[in-house]
C-alpha cells in the first residue's frame, strides 16, 4: 500500500521562521515582540538586535503553527513594522 503524503503546508503544521524586523523611529518604544507572543500561539526568540533613536532592527525567530506565524507576521506589518525573511544564516558563524 503506498504511503500517504503529508503536506508540510497545512495551516496547523509547526514551522520556524527567522525574520528581520525594522522599526521606524515612531514605533521603537512599542513592545511588538511581547505583543506577538501574547496575541498569537508563537514562541519568540530574539537572535540579534540593534536599537537606536532612529531605527530598530531585530532578527527574530518565530516558532509555532504555520497559520499563527503567518498571522503574527501580518499583524506586525499592519502595525507598521517592516518584516523580511532572513535569507542566509550569518548569526551562527
Regions found by a protein language model. Give the residues of each.
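Long, contiguous binding/interaction regions
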Residues: 1-56, 61-93
Amino acid at each position: 500500500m503506498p504511503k500517504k503524503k503529508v503536506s508540510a503546508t497545512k495551516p496547523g503544521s509547526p514551522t520556524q521562521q527567522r525574520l528581520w524586523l525594522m522599526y521606524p523611529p515612531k514605533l521603537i518604544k512599542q513592545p511588538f515582540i511581547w505583543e506577538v507572543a501574547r496575541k498569537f500561539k508563537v514562541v519568540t526568540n530574539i537572535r540579534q538586535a540593534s536599537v537606536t533613536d532612529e531605527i530598530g532592527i531585530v532578527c527574530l525567530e518565530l516558532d509555532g503553527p504555520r497559520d499563527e506565524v503567518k498571522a503574527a507576521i501580518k499583524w506586525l506589518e499592519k502595525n507598521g513594522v517592516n518584516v523580511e525573511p532572513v535569507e542566509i544564516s550569518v548569526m551562527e558563524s
